[in-house]
């Protein structure tokens, strides 16, 4: 398990570095207003994916050990196509500010992205974490290569370079996933069983509960973008989105751990083992994340202005406000994957609902008055409420003593020893 976590973390770190370079390139070329347009475009695609992943989401990971590939794949693909068509036609009702020329692209990109995600979740469900990680890493690699050609070699400065880059990233990732699952795809049409009632029932059952939480969580995490666009302007969205992206990079630690944790729990039947595993991973995740957040908070405004451009110096102030909530949300990510792994998706939904109440009340109150500062306060409080809700229920149902929540030196030494062992083994394998 530890080896898979290390591999996942390494992949996510590499992807984060590339995504950071992408953010820098877009900020320098497009400016704060153009970066705001890009952030809203990507966020709108993510909004459509919430509905696609009612069937094509994390429920695939949970159901992969229990249903044939063909049935899950066919049901997921048809559903994602339907959602892309419906949402593509009605997306401007949700976001009237989306440029008409981008509507069709948003619809098509959401469909291709969903196909790529289906492959990714099959790989995770089979606990083929290495392959899933390589599949994920390909997206930012293809994106930055496309952006480099479009903006640096061709010297263009419009948003369509980013759109073309997304096409390359999503489609390339999908093709790689097909290759990694080629045995399953080769047998796709050999299975003559056309009874999809059971798999559809399970996909909707688990997917609806899980995606309800993701739908609510989407507004917790990204409603501030749309409120800033409505009450202030896209330039403020650009600065705020960059600050959020940098701060949320801390979640690479917890999401790397949670991905392996989720696959392990979904394939295990021991509740006590799942609880102990979750607690141990939460403690080490918090310790590492706290150190990383301190480093981010110490960086001055001049650093961000130098890296992203003179319009982005305000990122430092935003990141410092977000920091406590970012740290608390690390706990939410680990505990949320615990509840998803045991099939209790509704717990994540209830936690997200609590956070959404905070987001709506504070967002509509603070953002029109305090712009990005109000948005940062809103997000930080919402993140914290999410984590507290799940933590309270987790400690109530788990039989842990108070001192079990303390990270001991012996545990740190064990983690370090395990890391050394895995790196040593990896070096030996490479020789």
Where are the regions a protein language model picked out?
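Signature of the first transmembrane helix
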Residues: 1-54, 205-235, 355, 360-361, ...
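Membrane-water interface segments that mark the loop-to-transmembrane alpha-helix transition
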Residues: 4-15, 40-41, 45-97, 101, ...
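Transmembrane helical elements of multi-pass membrane transporters/channels
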Residues: 4-19, 138-139, 143, 162-185, ...
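Helix-loop junctions and terminal segments of transmembrane helices
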Residues: 19, 23, 49-68, 247-272, ...
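Interfacial segments at transmembrane-helix termini and the short loops linking adjacent helices
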Residues: 32-36, 93-106, 234, 298-327, ...
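Membrane-interface junctions at transmembrane-helix termini in multi-pass inner-membrane proteins
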Residues: 59-68, 114-138, 266, 324-351
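Interhelical loop/hinge segments that connect adjacent transmembrane helices in multipass membrane
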Residues: 104, 130, 134-135, 155, ...
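Hydrophobic alpha-helical transmembrane segments
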Residues: 133-185, 244, 354-358, 372-396
């Amino acid at each position: 398990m530890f080896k898979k976590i290390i591999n996942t973390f390494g992949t996510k770190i590499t992807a984060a570095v590339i995504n950071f370079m992408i953010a820098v390139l877009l900020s320098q070329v497009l400016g704060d207003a153009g970066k705001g347009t890009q952030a809203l475009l990507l966020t709108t695609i993510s909004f459509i994916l919430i509905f696609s992943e009612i069937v094509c989401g994390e429920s695939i990971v949970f159901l992969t050990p229990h249903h044939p590939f063909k049935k899950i794949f066919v049901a997921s693909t048809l559903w994602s196509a339907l959602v892309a068509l419906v949402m593509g036609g009605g997306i401007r009702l949700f976001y009237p500010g989306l440029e008409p020329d981008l509507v069709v692209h948003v619809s098509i990109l959401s469909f291709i992205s969903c196909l790529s995600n289906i492959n990714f979740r099959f790989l995770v469900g089979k606990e083929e974490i290495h392959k899933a990680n390589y599949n994920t890493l390909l997206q930012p690699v293809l994106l930055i290569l496309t952006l480099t050609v479009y903006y640096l070699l061709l010297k263009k400065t419009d948003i369509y370079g980013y759109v073309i880059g997304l096409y390359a990233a999503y489609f390339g990732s999908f093709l790689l996933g097909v290759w990694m699952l080629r045995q399953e795809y080769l047998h796709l049409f050999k299975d003559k069983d056309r009874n999809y009632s059971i798999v559809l029932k399970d996909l909707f059952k688990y997917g609806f509960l899980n995606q309800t939480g993701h739908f609510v969580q989407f507004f917790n995490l990204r409603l501030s973008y749309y409120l800033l666009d409505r009450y202030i302007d896209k330039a403020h969205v650009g600065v705020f989105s960059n600050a959020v992206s940098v701060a949320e990079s801390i979640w690479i630690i917890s999401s790397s751990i949670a991905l392996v944790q989720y696959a392990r729990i979904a394939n295990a039947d021991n509740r006590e083992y799942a609880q102990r595993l979750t607690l141990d991973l939460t403690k080490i995740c918090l310790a590492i994340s706290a150190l990383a957040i301190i480093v981010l908070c110490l960086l001055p405004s001049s650093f961000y202005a130098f890296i992203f451009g003179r319009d982005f110096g305000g990122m430092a102030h935003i990141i410092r406000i977000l920091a406590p909530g970012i740290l608390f949300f690390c706990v939410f990510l680990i505990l949320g994957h615990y509840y998803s792994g045991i099939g209790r998706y509704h717990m994540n939904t209830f936690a997200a609902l609590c956070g959404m109440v905070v987001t709506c009340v504070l967002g509509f109150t603070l953002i029109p008055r305090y712009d990005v500062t109000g948005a940062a306060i809103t997000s930080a409080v919402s993140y914290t409420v999410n984590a507290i809700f799940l933590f309270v229920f987790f400690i109530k149902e788990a039989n842990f003593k108070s001192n079990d929540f303390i990270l001991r030196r012996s545990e740190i030494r064990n983690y370090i020893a395990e890391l050394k062992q895995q790196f040593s083994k990896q070096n030996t394998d490479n020789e």
